[in-house]
């Protein structure tokens, strides 16, 4: 009888240890999800040479930002945002006709895997961009080049950044990190 009670005691200890190990493992996994976009440029992201990019294809609209390792498709609507970036208010501008060409993408979107989090957080490092950085946009089978001339932060209610413009410009934006 005494040995049976001791075994039950050990089973309880093993169960507690197993639960603790599982909780630590889950915590480490969640931490990996949270930090994956910040370490991606160091580990996963290959440098982008804008001059070596394949020729723009008809029907494939892309935005390439070498400084932060972004090479993603963009399009109209929320579905496009889930695939890469959203072209906001297409009627207000595009690379070919000018106006305010507005592109928005997620800054941070946690996903079930670290690679998924990286892929769904293309503008995570948007704050690392600098004046003079180049941006390449493929639109309607042609390639357009932009250079950053102004960087500023806006509040979520400052929608004037999407306003129509006589000046041909590209506006990039994303939400701030929590």
Spans of model-derived segments:
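Serine/proline-rich low-complexity intrinsically disordered segments, especially terminal tails, linkers
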Residues: 5, 15, 38-40
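N-terminal Lys/Arg-rich, disordered targeting/topogenic segments
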Residues: 1-13
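Solvent-exposed, non-transmembrane regions of membrane-associated and secreted proteins
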Residues: 25-178
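Hydrophobic H-region at the start of alpha-helical membrane spans
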Residues: 13-24
């Amino acid at each position: 009888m005494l040995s049976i009670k001791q075994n039950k005691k050990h089973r309880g200890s093993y169960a507690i240890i197993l639960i603790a190990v599982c909780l630590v493992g889950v915590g480490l996994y969640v931490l990996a999800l949270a930090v994956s976009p910040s370490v991606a440029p160091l580990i996963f992201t290959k440098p982008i040479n804008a001059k070596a990019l394949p020729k723009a294809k008809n029907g494939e609209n892309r935005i390439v930002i070498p400084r932060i390792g972004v090479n993603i498709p963009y399009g109209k609507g929320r579905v496009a945002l889930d695939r890469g970036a959203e072209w906001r208010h297409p009627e207000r501008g595009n690379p070919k006709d000018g106006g305010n060409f507005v592109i928005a993408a997620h800054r941070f979107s946690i996903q079930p895997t670290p690679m998924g989090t990286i892929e769904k957080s293309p503008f995570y490092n948007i704050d690392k961009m600098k004046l003079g950085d180049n941006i390449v946009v493929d639109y309607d089978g042609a390639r357009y080049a932009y250079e950053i001339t102004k960087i500023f932060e806006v509040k979520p209610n400052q929608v004037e950044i999407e306003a129509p413009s006589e000046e041909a410009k590209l506006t990039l934006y994303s939400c701030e990190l929590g």
